[in-house]
Amino acid sequence: MADKKKKGSKKGGKKVDPFTRKEWYVVRAPTQFFKSPADNKVGFTPVNRTQGTKLASDGLKGRVYEVSLADMKDDESQVFRKIKLRAEEVEGRNVLTNFYGMDLTSDKLRSLIHKWSTLIECFVDVKTTDGYFLRVFAICFTKKGESQKKKTSYAKTSRVKAIRKKMVDILTETVSSNDLKTVVDYLIGVSLNGVTTNASGFAPTLAEKIRIEGSSIFPIHNVFIRKVKVLKTPKVDAAKLSELYASSATSTIAPTEEVGTAVERTEETTTTA
């Protein structure tokens, strides 16, 4: 005889939308990544509201965001560069981030590979003057000389080693003698009048330095800083972080908390008839 199933309705708990417990913050990046420094917003991020001793800002610090450099600079020529930003401080409803790495898109890397040429790559671990420990990867390819008729452009092992040594020397010297902000300028160079320069428009980028000096050993092209990893970071300095946001829009946004103005209290005097 089959067991009779108990009749009765199953009552489940009322489903609550988890986003009702969250609030949205504006994610901002240093002004050096933008064509217009006043507009340094990269997006929004949700976080649970402050409850008791659990602060919303603690849940935001340390988050890593990946943003296309083309979107920030409004420049389609930089569409293959991806910038990583890490949340360092929270001011009102603004999340202030700093550089945390760079990478190339996979389709860009695949498009660089061609036959009849030699691929040369290297990486270095080096520390900036302000205490950031970086691992920088570089890549380049040999090419045919101007008067070369042979279709292949393979380089001998001795030439490859010489170019690789030159790449390591340039990366080590440039990164170790500058702070993180200047190093980023060398990484995200823009093209001005056909000459590759850094964001300030004065010095060649790291990739351009390697191309110029490496070509004296053997003709090379398609030189790129393939990846940058931030291995160690110093303690966050609020003053230095605020310098990265000079002339930005963060100061024009009202804070989340309403702050009143102090008013002097006047005592009323009573008279008896």
From Swiss-Prot:
Its main location: cytoplasm. Transmembrane segments: none annotated. One of its GO terms (cellular component) is extracellular matrix. GO terms for molecular function: structural constituent of ribosome. The keyword Ribonucleoprotein applies. It is found in: Cytoplasm. Pfam families: Ribosomal_S3Ae. Coiled coil: none annotated. It comes from the Eukaryota. InterPro entries: Ribosomal_eS1 (IPR001593), Ribosomal_eS1_euk (IPR027500). Component of the small ribosomal subunit. Mature ribosomes consist of a small (40S) and a large (60S) subunit. The 40S subunit contains about 33 different proteins and 1 molecule of RNA (18S). The 60S subunit contains about 49 different proteins and 3 molecules of RNA (25S, 5.8S and 5S). PANTHER family: 40S RIBOSOMAL PROTEIN S3A. Belongs to the eukaryotic ribosomal protein eS1 family. This is Small ribosomal subunit protein eS1. The lineage of its organism: Eukaryota, Amoebozoa, Evosea, Eumycetozoa, Dictyostelia. The gene is rps3a.
